From Swiss-Prot:
Topological relation to the membrane, as annotated: Peripheral membrane protein
Family indicated by similarity: Belongs to the SNAP family.
GO molecular function per UniProt: ATPase activator activity; soluble NSF attachment protein activity; syntaxin binding
Keywords: ER-Golgi transport, Membrane, Protein transport, Transport
UniProt function note: Required for vesicular transport between the endoplasmic reticulum and the Golgi apparatus.
UniProt keyword Protease present: no
Organism: Komagataella phaffii (strain GS115 / ATCC 20864)
Domain of life: Eukaryota
Protein name, entry field: Vesicular-fusion protein SEC17
Subcellular localization, as worded in the UniProt entry: Membrane
Keyword Membrane set for record: yes
Amino acid sequence: MSEAEQLIAKADKKCAPVSGFASFFSGSGSYRFEEAADLYTQAANLYRIQRKSNKAGHVFEKAADAQIKADSKDEAANSLIEAYKCYKLDAPSDAARCLNKAVEFFALKGQFRRGANFKAELAELYETKMADPKHAILAYEEAGEWYRGDSAEALANKCYVKAADLSCSDEVQDFLKAAESYERIAKESLNNSLAKWSLKDYFFKAILCRLALNDYPSASALLERFVSWDPTFEKTREYEFALKLVDGLKEGDPDIIASASHEYDQISRLDNFKVKILNKIKNNIRDSDDLAEDDLT
């Protein structure tokens, strides 16, 4: 039996129910569970040293269970965070489960800033390791709310933007929600000197999302609204580009979209996010043309 296994066996014994005369010598239940948690933690760290991450994560969870029984929820949350770190690379679903439980403890304690930090990590885990954009969106939005409650506006906006971006993903495609999110973020950033540099990007993304919904009247109305919020927007390349895109959709001409995109890309490189939505706008026009031809035959 390895040293880690011996420590686990001792801890398991301390966690076992004790009754009758034996309970007189075993000490209080709380103390026994605290001792067991210490033993589990030692064993988990040994597994860590041996690079047996999944085993370490499992034993950190056992430590958390013992700490909960000892009514040491703060310690339990910390053990669950350690379990999450161990699972993160090879067992992301277990990592997410542990992180969720830890965040619940932080929330119950009113530690919303710490909870927000780990909620954002959870969202990133869903996004990058588990390919689960829907859960990632929910986690980013909740992290944003907690950051906002702690007056961390920049961090809140970062989470809200991530959620909005994921709402535009191929798996979700909720462009209405994304458009409304970008618009709200922009409005709340108007008087923020640091966030003001990002305004034109928020404006442009909101308009793109409306165009992806074939809703050029709303996109055109947004252009006017954004200029009323920030008159400098009218002098940007993003405004000129958006104006041409609205015209292209209104005319039902994908070539206008393609030409405007190429012209903009020559000076300001379009990222993959925007390219995908621009392609969707073009394809929507072509699809509607095909349907119109079918109606005539």
